[in-house]
């Protein structure tokens, strides 16, 4: 439906902002890499395409191919038409017959196939309780604490709902390739990223710092979450977690890098990494928002 398309597109647009705020994996095997290294690591580790630059095929780990025009169906159609099945599963179900009789098809083949294509915002059909459609927010990291993860989800949902009513007017101002570039730039630079951000008043592309974009949007999120039926006492502490992270400019990635730099003054790299991880585990277990970590 158009409602799904608008919300999904809005979610795609704001995902780079949340990735930048939530970045939490700045090192791998002792090396300093991207602020959210998990994103390029997963993409490269799953990419088994032949190295043919003249005849490229779509990556199975993908931010997306374009803005959604009509609804979820085109995302499922893309999955079927652009990617070969990895795990064959042929059921005896006649999905159309089940539908004609008022039932909910299981769609075993589609669901298994969709599970082998890793869109960072992945649409999922589930036949449970008469069938439902959901979006997996796969781009956001685990940690640093449970409250940080809840805050990331509140930020993503609130921002997407905020931009949903005007998303069709905004899309001509940001080609999808720019949004994809935003996603990887956010993963690379974290809160220091400058992203291309659309405006109905622009006459050329404009790049803005992540904090600058969010400072104007975050005050509008509570009204959106209230309108969706969320309880103010539940979500306002989460919004405050995001605001504090914005004020301190400290997310999980920044804390890890800063802590490593401090520890490296007194010990070798390996010992510093172990000590940093131990402190991370203590803070995470105490469910302290990362903006308050010392």
Summary of predicted features, one role per range:
Residues 1-134, 138-141, 170-174:
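Loop-rich catalytic cores of soluble enzymes, especially ATP-dependent carboxylate-amine ligases
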